[in-house]
Amino acid sequence: MKIGTDGVLLGAWCSLENIPDTILDIGSGTGILALMMAQRSSASIIDAIEIDEDAFEQTVQNFELSDWGDRLYGYHASCKEFTAEIVEEGETYDLIISNPPFYSDTYPSNDSARNKARFTVHLSFEELLASVAKMLAKDGNFAVIIPFKEEAYFTNIAKKYHLHVTRRCRVKGNDKTEIKRSLLELSFRETIVKSEELTLEKDRHQYTDAYRNLVKDFYLKL
């Protein structure tokens, strides 16, 4: 699987102000989010779970090739299985981050691996948020990127689990296009939401200064 813009956006935008010591990446794919968290933070434990076997193997390989392999741990498990184990052990995470499957209103393709990565039939927002609520420390943060059209639906489910939006960034490709993505940060604390908007391009392959400044530490060339 190629590294997508969504993952890099989330990994760069996610706040580390609470100085997390334990981080969980749900649905790691290639491991990009966990690797970005290792680069940006001094967290001693960064766990990553992935249900797809091929993607999991790629995650582990990327961890081993990185400079932070001693802090990165991959688990081949479903979100539900992993959550049950963490709850049983009485553990929590200071930060949970996820670029979850979406396109819930689109028919799956013939590529089963791609389907697992992109369709909510494999990890619904309900299941994701229920798991986050069980594994997140009481003063922890949960960062996620979702389609903008799903934002209201997602945040309504989150409220059921006492998770409230604290930061929000709505993303669009350029000034002429509609908002496509919502970057959200949630916690168990109710507070005034810090909202912003990000435009990625001024023109085709001509990136805005705001986007460049956000992701510059993660691209060799942009």
Annotate each PLM feature.
Residues M1-E17:
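S-adenosyl-L-methionine
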Residues E91, S112-N115, K160-Y161:
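Glycine-rich, phosphate-binding/catalytic loops in enzymes
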Residues T177-L222:
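SAM/dcSAM-binding transferase cores
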Residues A12-S109:
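Conserved SAM/SAH cofactor-binding pocket of Class I
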Residues P100-E127, S131:
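Mobile active-site "lid"/loop adjacent to the S-adenosyl-L-methionine
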Residues I3, L123-I179:
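Conserved Class I SAM-dependent methyltransferase catalytic core
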Residues L10, N99, L128, L186:
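Residue-level signal for inorganic ion chemistry
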